[in-house]
């Protein structure tokens, strides 16, 4: 039987993932950087919950300081149900630890339904 990873497994894996992510940071962030630069965006929305939201809160100040733009963080539930009035000058980023959060996938569907491009893996 396959071992299903728990939060403790992810915590134990963190040092290696951090080293790899820092080493590959330019390649990992290139699609988002290219989209931001070419899109003429003025603000960023981050759609995230749980630990993804916590990480996004940490990134928020860094992004604001370096990009000189406003960063709004909203949960997938609120984004899908009511708070999705982003404009053409708002870049919307959905963050999910696993990539399979149903609420996050629903948020992506809202973004795509508004004719916006989504970057990342294909939806299951």
Please identify what each model-predicted range represents:
Residues 27-30, 37-124:
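Glycine-rich phosphate-binding loops that contact phosphosugars or nucleotide phosphates
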Residues 1-39:
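Cofactor-/ligand-binding subdomain signature composed of acidic, glycine-rich
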